[in-house]
Amino acid sequence: MKEHLKKIKETIDVEHGYSLGTVFTTRNKQYMYDTGTGKVFECGVNEYRILKSLFEQTKLPNEVEGVSEEELEAAYRNIWEMVEAEHILQVSPNLKFVRETDETLRDLLRYDLQQVILELTEQCNMRCRYCIYNEHNEGYRNFSPKAMTWDVAKRAVEYARDNSGNKVAISFYGGEPLVQFELMKKTIDYSRQIIKGKELTFSFSTNLTLVTPEIAAYVAGVEGMSVLASIDGPEGIHDAYRVMSGGKGSFEKAIQGLKYLVEAFGERAKESMVINTVVCPPFSAKKLDAIKEFFEGLSWLPKEMVKKCDYVEYRSVREEDISMEYAGDGEFIGEELDGFTLDAIEGWALARDLEEEDSKSYVAGIVADKLVRIHNRRQTQEPCKDLRRNGCCIPGNRRVYVKTDGKFLLCEKTGDAPDIGNVYEGADLEKIKKYYMDEYDEKSIARCNECWARNLCGLCYAACYETEGIDMERKEKVCGAHRYATKGELISYYSILEEKPEVIEEIDAVPYY
């Protein structure tokens, strides 16, 4: 044992063991994830216990309870052979974020813009109790009667035309964008008129309550249009949080609007529409089962339509607004595996999916959506020598969010973060570098180098910026949640791989953004 233990200690940085990887278990097997290469390996029980000690306590034990010296020697030999053959557990502690040169960044902003999102209005006809724009949510604007002018909308479309590559998306946001349907329609028509020789697509998110047969017919008739439709499940669950500005539930209007759109799109509804469901606490199997049964019971809703199910935004719902109607009675909401409990939605969806055979079921879609990031993770033969900037996009390249006054933000989720330009002067390269590269890199790199999930991280600017720039206290809280979620995704992925490998084969067809 001492021979292989000594070799391992001489080769890897035991003191920084917490950054080298993590271990996780499914119902049937034990695994390790290697930070440097992105590889995942199945482990024997003894190897698992050694690696768990390394990753969680930064120690390589000389003895393990219940394990003989010979068995421990064999386990260390196996680990050493993997270190040699697969180059695992060998991460440099001082990596730097990949950074575009000024010239590359300038070219991406000028010639490769992918999406422009227009905030048509700050007004909404609803007052969802979990909405980030409610007065009790700091760091975000409140609802207001502000609306985008035609001049701003026109300039935003021209900016999209002039700074995009072979394809570009024009999207609409609010408030509720259908409050300004005539402006939305005028903007779509103008976009189709001036953007030629490119693949042009459109999209908007809606609470569905303002959809009429006429609006649905127009929307469905726009080539390249897609709709993100917000509905939270059956009437009791939906109306607990999604209420009109006067406090009345919105379910009846929302379900009617959804039906109008499905009828207008016809066969194309399954690929042109996405259902977005927000789940609020308490997170019970009773509530999640009710949501599942509701969507599966709508005979007119295409089974193949993508249905997303996710948590309410962090800190956006007040304790006094929480509805306890679907609290359940202590039933299963997350499976515990070696001391790690899968989060409520993930644990519930995984358990239900493993019980079902239908690859088009509601839970199958949720599980597949959460597995794409693990499936497409960065994998290398030898440890990577750099770091991606977590889940952050290249500011001003992936998308630009145009506020009602014409200012550019990174996206619709960044709240009161520093702007990056406007429709009159274009993207501001210096602001982008100052706030979203220099400051982010300087304040984040040390912590990222210490984190085993750094190459799987989905955390982006939206989670950690305020008016003056990055908020590291907020970011570090969100980091913990992301690590937790990432381990859950690893468990789900390898659980499905063990029991329903055909699902993993189909993931290549799932879009990854």
What is each PLM-predicted segment?
Residues R77-E100, G391, G396-E430:
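A broadly conserved sequence feature marking short terminus-proximal activation segments
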Residues E3-E42, E71-I117:
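N-terminal [4Fe-4S]-dependent radical SAM core
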Residues H4-K7, I12-L20, K407-F408, K413-Y513:
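Flexible mid-to-C-terminal extensions adjoining Fe-S/redox cofactors in radical SAM and related proteins
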Residues D239-I255, K259, E263-G391, P395, ...:
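Radical SAM enzyme [4Fe-4S]-AdoMet core and its adjacent flexible, acidic
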Residues A153-S171, Q180-V312:
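Radical SAM/AdoMet-radical enzyme domain recognition
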